[in-house]
């Protein structure tokens, strides 16, 4: 925040100049972190891949403050001597599904600081972070990914932050009439003729609503629980029983035509980094409800099986992020991360396809 603070940072973080000693200390620090997870394998390549991936999960969020606690808030103001470590690089659409929950297990000591950072961002910009970078809100990606991330910390019982303030931040962020939410509250869903990437936005909002509902239930806020739980079922508007896909629905209640579940046009259709094959499964919070849309477990499981064996061709100007395709299952992209585990709910046999897929 100042030349004086820069000197303090240097004195605290690098009081002397010994490159070899500094490199050795960094090696020891990373070794201690990576040893938090042990695997057994004789495959050196698999071990290297695993620990490289584990390292990547620890690169962000990153500290964004001086050693004396000074930091620049998302409102542009400088805050002095904060009683918590301020963080940034909240790539939440990318991390709330797996990396953020993993952090609660591997780095529980960081959770109070991360939660307090998110609450201060809420106070400074009026909502929880969506995709915060260097103290600035980028509003990148769809949905309200800060909500499930903060809700996870509340529901796992981490302390060091105000749970009532956390709930206020969750609720207010879920009720803001921006980024398609105003349309969602008017129509009950986001119409595809009025908003781009409508299916993706709405289905992510539905998942976030479920997270708000769970915190409301935990805190005894029954009316809010009922409201957000019902709103979390908005995904049902998009399910077409004829094609058995999630499809864009316009403001007149008509499915978008023509329809091609293999097509994905980056930032210019009803989905985000995906297509109907991939987004149809984005209901991890209500799998039984999604099974009901299909008419039962047999039809659901049959469609899920098809996901892994249909053509891997992506039609249209698809994003390169839709990667690692096995059929239309995109192993390399976020909306597919949970998909193989859906078998644990739908499959009735002892040997789950999840085992072989994983």
Question: What are the functions of these language-model segments?
Answer:
Residues 21-32, 63-89, 117-128, 175-192, ...:
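Active-site-adjacent bridging/hinge elements
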Residues 83-92, 135-143, 194-205, 264-279, ...:
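Solvent-exposed loop and edge beta-strand segments that line ligand/cofactor-binding
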Residues 110-239:
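Active-site cavity-forming subdomains of large catalytic enzyme subunits
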Residues 218-336:
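Catalytic cores of carbohydrate-active enzymes
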Residues 9-14, 18, 26-34, 211-215, ...:
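N-terminal leader/propeptide and maturation segments of large enzyme subunits in energy/redox metabolism
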Residues 348-354:
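Conserved small/polar residues in nucleotide/adenosyl-binding loops
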Residues 52-65, 88-111, 151-157, 210-219, ...:
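Alpha-helical support elements that line or immediately flank enzyme active sites
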Residues 1-86, 120, 127-130, 160, ...:
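Acidic/polar, glycine-enriched structural segments that form the non-catalytic walls/loops
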């Amino acid at each position: 925040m100042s030349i004086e603070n820069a000197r303090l940072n240097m004195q605290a973080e690098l009081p002397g100049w010994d490159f070899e000693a500094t490199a050795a200390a960094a090696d020891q620090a990373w070794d201690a972190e990576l040893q938090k997870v042990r695997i057994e394998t004789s495959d050196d390549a698999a071990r290297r891949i695993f620990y490289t991936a584990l390292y990547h999960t620890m690169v962000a969020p990153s500290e964004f403050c001086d050693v004396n606690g000074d930091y620049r808030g998302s409102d542009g103001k400088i805050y002095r001597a904060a009683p918590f470590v301020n963080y940034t690089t909240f790539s939440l659409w990318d991390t709330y599904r797996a990396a953020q929950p993993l952090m609660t297990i591997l780095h529980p000591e960081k959770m109070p600081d991360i939660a307090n950072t998110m609450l201060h961002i809420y106070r400074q910009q009026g909502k929880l972070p969506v995709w915060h970078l260097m103290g600035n809100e980028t509003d990148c990606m769809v949905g309200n990914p800060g909500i499930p991330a903060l809700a996870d910390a509340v529901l796992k019982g981490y302390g060091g932050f105000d749970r009532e303030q956390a709930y206020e931040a969750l609720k207010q962020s879920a009720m803001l009439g921006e980024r398609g939410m105003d349309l969602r509250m008017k129509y009950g869903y986001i119409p595809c003729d009025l908003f781009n990437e409508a299916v993706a936005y709405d289905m992510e909002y539905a998942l976030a609503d479920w997270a708000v509902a769970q915190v409301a239930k935990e805190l005894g806020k029954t009316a809010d629980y009922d409201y957000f739980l019902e709103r979390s079922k908005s995904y049902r508007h998009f399910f077409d029983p004829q094609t058995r896909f999630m499809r864009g629905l316009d403001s007149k209640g008509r499915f978008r035509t023509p329809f091609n579940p293999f097509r994905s046009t980056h930032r210019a259709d009803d989905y985000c980094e995906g297509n109907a094959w991939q987004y149809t499964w984005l209901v991890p919070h209500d799998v039984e409800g999604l099974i009901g849309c299909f008419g039962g477990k047999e039809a659901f499981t049959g469609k899920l099986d098809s996901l892994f064996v249909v053509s891997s061709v992506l039609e249209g100007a698809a994003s390169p992020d839709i990667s690692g395709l096995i059929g239309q299952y995109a192993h390399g992209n976020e909306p597919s991360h949970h998909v193989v585990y859906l078998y644990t709910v739908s499959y009735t046999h002892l040997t789950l396809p999840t085992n072989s897929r994983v």
